[in-house]
């Protein structure tokens, strides 16, 4: 077991305590730690015995080459790519909206959200696409409820090629 000094000197534990005590809103862990070790630290200090909000990860990917081809800055925020193996429709919507809020805050501009699937607008009838479509509809209603329609645009279910380029997208 780690003693108090060792715990506080471990950045991920210190960050989790900062969130616990309201000194931070989130933890940025980078790629120097495994996701599991970050979530173990967070769960160690989490106070709510029955969590009302699920934990999830946001990955920020910079692809400057994409800005030339697809427009924008080439900055992509990916919601929960490796934490929750089978999120519910409600969780997927929550992850999408919260990730969009963080992206909007960090970029200082309105953002577009693509709820990625193997299907675009029902082109492939499958359960996973149906779940993604339902999550997109719920996310849109959450954005509307929070009066963020002008700040966050949600599209889905949609395949990645269609999400990146409107030239690929025709319904």
Question: In which residue ranges do the predicted regions lie?
Answer:
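Anion-binding alpha/beta catalytic cores of soluble intermediary-metabolism enzymes, centered on
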Residues: 1-171
């Amino acid at each position: 077991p780690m003693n108090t000094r060792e715990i506080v000197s471990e950045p991920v534990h210190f960050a989790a305590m900062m969130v616990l005590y309201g000194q931070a809103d989130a933890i940025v862990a980078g790629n120097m730690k495994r996701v599991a070790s970050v979530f173990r630290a967070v769960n160690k200090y989490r106070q709510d015995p029955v969590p009302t909000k699920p934990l999830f990860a946001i990955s920020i990917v910079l692809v400057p080459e994409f800005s030339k081809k697809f427009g924008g800055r080439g900055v992509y925020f990916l919601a929960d790519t490796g934490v929750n193996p089978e999120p519910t429709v409600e969780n997927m919507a929550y992850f999408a909206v919260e990730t969009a809020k963080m992206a909007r805050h960090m970029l200082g501009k309105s953002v577009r959200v693509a709820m990625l699937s193997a299907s675009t607008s029902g082109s492939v009838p499958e359960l996973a696409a149906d779940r993604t479509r339902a999550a997109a509809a719920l996310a849109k209603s959450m954005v509307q409820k929070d009066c963020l329609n002008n700040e966050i645009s949600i599209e889905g279910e949609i395949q990645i090629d269609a999400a990146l380029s409107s030239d690929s997208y025709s319904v």
